[in-house]
From Swiss-Prot:
Keywords from the named record: Cytoplasm, mRNA processing, mRNA splicing, mRNA transport, Nonsense-mediated mRNA decay, Nucleus, RNA-binding, Translation regulation, Transport
PROSITE patterns named in the record: RRM
Similarity comment text for this entry: Belongs to the RBM8A family.
Keyword Iron: no
Annotated compartments: Nucleus; Cytoplasm
Protein's UniProt name: RNA-binding protein Y14B
Biased composition (Acidic residues): 1-28
Chain's gene name: Y14B
Domain RRM: 90-168
Lineage of source species: Eukaryota, Viridiplantae, Streptophyta, Embryophyta, Tracheophyta
Superkingdom, taxonomy of origin: Eukaryota
Listed GO biological process terms: mRNA processing; mRNA transport; nuclear-transcribed mRNA catabolic process, nonsense-mediated decay; regulation of translation; RNA splicing
Function: Core component of the splicing-dependent multiprotein exon junction complex (EJC) deposited at splice junctions on mRNAs. The EJC is a dynamic structure consisting of core proteins and several peripheral nuclear and cytoplasmic associated factors that join the complex only transiently either during EJC assembly or during subsequent mRNA metabolism.
Source organism: Oryza sativa subsp. japonica (Rice)
Region (Disordered) location: 1-39
GO molecular function: mRNA binding
Length: 197
């Protein structure tokens, strides 16, 4: 079966415009049958690569210059780390929300720190209970900062909630990590090795 797969030739039914014009000229001269001629398959060698798309025919220097270009919002005033303002306002992520919490509970709690522009509490479809997090939006940075300082690590409906910025500027991994940098071994830990034997 493997030998038969190597002997197969690839057939291309796409025709170039010039070949189509030549075939039409032959039909007009009466070289063909009375009807329209059937397409003739062209055999394509395996060495030819067909490519399509936006980057076809571009030089490698153009491709290399566009490789690392991304859309971004430049903030010349504060290029460092910290919170990032969304289009509407300053959005906080509240995690650790109790399952039976309602939007009114969160709204009443967070409205003490300023005008809550929007509040979204995600609910589980099957049960109707909260998924455990909420998004709270404030108009001003000061109100959001006050809410974070006051509510982070406090009790809300007998559960400890953690409040932080939903969007932040800077790298994904902080330069000063709390975990020590050490090489990981490729061998499995002893507790897993005992289970496999």
């Amino acid at each position: 079966m493997a030998a038969a797969a190597e002997d197969v030739e690839f057939v291309d039914y796409d025709r170039d415009e010039e070949e189509e014009e030549d075939a039409m000229d032959e039909d007009d001269r009466g070289g063909g049958r009375g009807g329209r001629a059937l397409p003739v398959p062209h055999i394509v060698s395996q060495g030819v690569m067909r490519s399509r798309g936006r980057l076809l025919g571009r030089s490698t220097s153009v491709l290399a210059s566009n490789r690392d270009r991304f859309d971004s919002l430049a903030d010349a005033g504060n290029p460092g780390h910290g919170p990032q303002r969304s289009i509407e306002g300053w959005i906080l992520l509240v995690s650790g929300v109790k399952e039976d919490a309602e939007e009114d509970d969160l709204y009443n709690t967070f409205s003490d720190f300023g005008h809550v522009k929007d509040l979204h509490l995600n609910l589980e479809r099957r049960t109707g209970y909260a998924k455990g997090y909420a998004l709270v939006e404030y108009e001003s940075f000061e109100e959001a900062q006050t809410a974070i300082k006051a509510m982070n690590g406090t009790q809300l409906l007998t559960r400890t909630v953690y409040v932080d910025w939903a969007f932040s500027r800077g790298p994904i991994q902080k330069l000063t990590s709390t975990r020590p940098l050490h090489r990981r071994s490729r061998t499995p830990p002893r507790r897993l090795a005992a289970l496999t034997c």
